């Protein structure tokens, strides 16, 4: 059966009937091969031809305008790069290759007896644009298990980090050290053809994703479990299950939560700090280890990956001040006090979204199913009813609705993972699925070195005809 999405129908109309056969990510027969690299090798020439045709016809078309405020405002809303794996709609939220989170939850393969999608399936979708079969997902699970072992120098490095070194710093350093294993770096030094770049980027990306749970688990065990062993990878288990086992958690609900968490945090289009960083560094032909390590340094920033930690701190302070069973009016007063003191309510608002984040919604549904009476969840649910109205009354927020960070920490706390400093590491492991999928395609499509033009304030004033003051 051939599938055609709404966006792809629009693209087909734009290109005209004679070129519509090139819309391979929109109208296609699902691949039957279980080897992801083989599937990619078949797709890439068709996608290259599609983009070549599109650029030949529309390369000079103007797609927007840039204002002075955009330059000073972090380039918000500026259309400036191609990112294939996901698109963030202000009203609908994230779509992975055109599929919403509820659709992914329904369509992606599950573990035996499980209800949440396997991240392996999401990775296949991000790379190929196709919903994988159970056999294809099982192939990815086995492939990652086979590639998971860490080189001895990385193990030694992790075991000798000081305990006061932040978990994200440890993650970034360990990933950088894996650069010694890069097949792309070796192949590039040997002068491989540009048309082969993607093959080695693929191999490095698969290796890195496979090894990340081992790195992350060692960091956790060294910091919080007295350096106890992470154990061995079980090739019969999926990626998330192995990860939770290595962390030391065996609760089946927590394993399901990890599958959901690693799926929904994987990608959020290309303009966020971690995704853009990996894209930028990768454009210099740095290998995936270096590009991803750079992305993790961005994710470690408090304005990007530390938000769920800030939510928990705020919730904890709220409980200490008001107690666990608090009235709606007292909550309203507390929220107003937070806002009137010049602070924000953490976990609410988003740079792009203008509705409730669907990543929040699916975590809320998980909590309603598995921990409806948990005091911290009940507080989060109560805030969901109150905070948006207060923010609307205040009149400053463009988006008064909760984002993913308003909920994720609460779920981790419930299942016993209390170490808030570690949460961003989980975010990082998940984000690898998205940014490395795109990195493969960036090299397959021959994207050049990213080099935008910068301007000084004086130069900008001259450009717009303003008088210098």
Curated annotation (Swiss-Prot):
Record flagged with keyword Transferase = yes
Q: What is one process in the GO biological process aspect for this record?
A: tricarboxylic acid cycle
Which terms does the record give in the GO molecular function aspect?
citrate (Si)-synthase activity; identical protein binding
Protein's pathway = Carbohydrate metabolism; tricarboxylic acid cycle; isocitrate from oxaloacetate: step 1/2
Return the transit peptide range from the UniProt record: 1-31
- Report if keyword Disulfide bond is assigned: no
Q: What does this protein do?
A: Key enzyme of the Krebs tricarboxylic acid cycle which catalyzes the synthesis of citrate from acetyl coenzyme A and oxaloacetate.
Oligomeric and partner information: Homodimer.
| Sequence similarity | Belongs to the citrate synthase family.
Q: What is this protein called?
A: Citrate synthase, mitochondrial
Q: Which organism is it from?
A: Amblyrhynchus cristatus (Galapagos marine iguana)
Query: What does UniProt list as this organism's lineage?
Result: Eukaryota, Metazoa, Chordata, Craniata, Vertebrata
């Amino acid at each position: 059966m051939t599938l055609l999405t709404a966006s792809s129908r629009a693209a087909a109309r734009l290109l005209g009937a004679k070129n519509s056969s090139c819309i391979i990510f929109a109208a296609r027969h699902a691949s039957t091969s279980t080897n992801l690299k083989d599937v990619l090798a078949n797709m890439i020439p068709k996608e290259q031809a599609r983009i070549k045709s599109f650029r030949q016809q529309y390369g000079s078309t103007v797609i927007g305008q840039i204002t002075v405020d955009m330059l000073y405002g972090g380039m918000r809303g500026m259309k400036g790069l191609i990112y294939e794996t996901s698109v963030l709609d202000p009203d609908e939220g994230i779509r992975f290759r055109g599929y919403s989170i509820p659709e992914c939850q329904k369509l992606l393969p599950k573990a035996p007896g499980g209800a949440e999608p396997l991240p392996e399936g999401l990775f296949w979708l991000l790379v190929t644009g196709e919903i994988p079969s159970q056999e294809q997902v099982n192939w990815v699970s086995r492939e990652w298990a086979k590639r998971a072992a860490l080189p001895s120098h990385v193990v030694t490095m992790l075991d000798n980090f000081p305990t006061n070194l932040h978990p994200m710093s440890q993650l970034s350093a360990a990933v950088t050290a894996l650069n010694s294993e890069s097949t792309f770096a070796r192949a590039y030094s040997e002068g491989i053809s540009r048309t082969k770049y993607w093959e080695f980027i693929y191999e490095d990306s698969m290796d890195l994703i496979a090894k990340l749970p081992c790195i992350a688990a060692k960091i956790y065990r060294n910091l919080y479990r007295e350096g106890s062993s992470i154990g061995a990878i079980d090739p019969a288990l999926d990626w998330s299950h192995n990860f939770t086992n290595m962390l030391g958690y065996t609760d089946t609900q927590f394993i399901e939560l990890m599958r959901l968490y690693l799926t929904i945090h994987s990608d959020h289009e290309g303009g966020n700090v971690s995704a853009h960083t990996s894209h930028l560094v990768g454009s210099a032909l740095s290998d995936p280890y270096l590009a991803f390590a750079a992305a993790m340094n961005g994710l470690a920033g408090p304005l990007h990956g530390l938000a769920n930690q800030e939510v928990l701190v705020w919730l904890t302070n709220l409980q200490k001040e008001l107690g666990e069973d608090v009235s709606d009016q007292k909550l309203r007063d507390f929220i107003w006090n937070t806002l009137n003191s010049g602070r924000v309510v953490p976990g609410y608002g988003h740079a792009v979204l203008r509705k409730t984040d669907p990543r929040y919604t699916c975590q809320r549904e998980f909590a309603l199913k598995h921990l409806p009476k948990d005091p911290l969840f009940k507080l989060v649910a109560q805030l969901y009813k109150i905070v948006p109205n207060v923010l609307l009354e205040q009149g400053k927020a463009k988006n008064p609705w909760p984002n993913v960070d308003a909920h994720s920490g609460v779920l981790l706390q419930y299942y016993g993972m209390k170490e808030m400093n570690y949460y961003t590491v989980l975010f990082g492991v998940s984000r690898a699925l998205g940014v490395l999928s795109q990195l493969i395609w960036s090299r397959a499509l021959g994207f050049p070195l990213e080099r935008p033009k910068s301007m000084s304030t004086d130069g900008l004033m001259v450009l717009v005809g303003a008088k210098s003051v």
